[in-house]
Amino acid sequence: MATTSGPAGIAMGSVGSLLERQDFSPEELRAALAGSRGSRQPDGLLRKGLGQREFFSYLHLPKKDGKTTKRAPRNEPDYATLYYREHPRAGDFSKTSLPERGRFDKCRIRPSVFKPPVGSGKGFLSMQSLAAHKGQKLWRSNGSLHTLACHPPLSPGPRASQARAQLLHALSLDEGGPEPSLSDSSSGGSFGRSPGTGPSPFSSSLGHINHLGGSLDRAPRSPKESGPLAVLSCLPEPPPPYEFSCPTTEEVAVLPEAREELKRDLGDQDVSNSFTQVLEERQRLWLSELKRLYVERLHEVAQKAERSERNLQLQLFMAQQEQRRLRKELRAQQGLAPEPRTSGSSMEADPNARPEEEARWEVCQKTAEISLLKQQLREAQAELAQKLAEIFSLKTQLRGSRAQAQAQDAELARLREAVHSLQEQAPREEAPGSCETDDCKSRGLLGEAGGSEAREGAEQLRAELLQERLRGQEQALRFEQERQTWQEEKERVLRYQREIQGSYMDMYRRNQALEHELRLLREPPTSWSPRLESSKI
């Protein structure tokens, strides 16, 4: 490669040599792309253009030494030499240099720029910050490399030229990004990106390489070199290449729909799917275990509540017993206390008297007892009403049995009259028997036979009448016993009610006395008022 040395001692070639140094043989291309993936994706579809690994392997292909490479002589002017002569402070134009703020200071590309992003997008952010810092005017830099691609030097083979065209399409991506989906004429594959996506981190990092040609285009040129470059810059822009883009918000929004569709597809499949059966079995096991744990926990909570309730009841009972014992002791002390004689002694005995709180507590207790007696009275009245209703029903049954007995007595009287009439008719038929003939004798025999049948019927009626009388007497006896029992119950209930009313009145009088004593305790004691005796309960 023909180079010239400037003041800084940096090697530099022509603009055409920038692409000529990338030439390599088909064997080198095959060796570089051998370790990459095939032309199909895991789902069986064709891949779009070059992948990241293939593109990186292309960038890192071994280059031939420029000093040993033989090239055919060219007659076109050396634009780099002319530019360097006019701009002595220019920097390095080699493959590892990058422009910065319009100056060609030496800036090497670190290998981390071309590493694929890993993790949660931290690499993407670093690339985007690099592009925002150094690539504010990168959208102008595509023209020079596109013009260079339109007139490529001699290449070893068609496959290398095709790979170079794909590389140039990847390098020609703007900072803002073109509108999606135009076809690549050189590679034959359709490239595009989703609408609404911003510049990818990879395209941002490659913008510095594209900026090299743009810087050369923006440099001042001599009249000799402006002609060929003007012709090259008049060529049309190539179609936008494929851009490596990260998932966008629209793609993320489509994910739930895809998940639902996958669930529907799984649901439409055969029920005997082993994966679905395993999931359902695990779900059933989890539900059963959860229910069992819930029942056990509920049982433990119920047992704990029962234990706490029993403990509270026991404590309440013990407190009531202690209260009764203390009240008995207090009453015993009050009964054994000597009666005061003078007002001075009564004033001294006042601190030992029953306190106001204890009197209030006794009033509350008596009120509770009164309410309990009222409840018992209401229960006794309800029971009395029930007994009265039963007595009324028994009286109704007694009336019915009496009416039935009267009907039976009427039937019995009728039967008696029939028997008497039959007995009176029998002697009348036997009286004219002295002058009877054979026919009369035969008739008399028939009459005797009929009389015997009547007597048997009368005896049967007498037996039935006797049974009915005995049954009526038994019913009357049972009714009398039941009436006596109900009378005793009624007297007992009335006596109990009178006792309850009497105890209620006694309790009311005691309550009035306690309230009066409480009022006296609340009033300030005077020297001339005598001390009232507390009523004994």
UniProtKB/Swiss-Prot annotation:
Q: Bias regions of kind Basic and acidic residues — which residues?
A: 351-361
**One cellular component GO annotation, for this chain's record?**
dendrite
Q: Keywords assigned by UniProt?
A: Cell projection, Coiled coil, Cytoplasmic vesicle, Developmental protein, Neurogenesis, Phosphoprotein
Modified residue Phosphoserine is at which positions? S172
> Pfam families, per this entry?
Fez1
- Ranges where the record places region Disordered: 173-234, 328-361, 423-458
Q: How does it assemble?
A: Binds NEDD4. Interacts with 14-3-3 proteins. Interacts with MAVS.
Question: What is the similarity comment for this entry?
Answer: Belongs to the N4BP3 family.
Q: This chain belongs to which protein, by name?
A: NEDD4-binding protein 3
Q: Which organism is it from?
A: Mus musculus (Mouse)
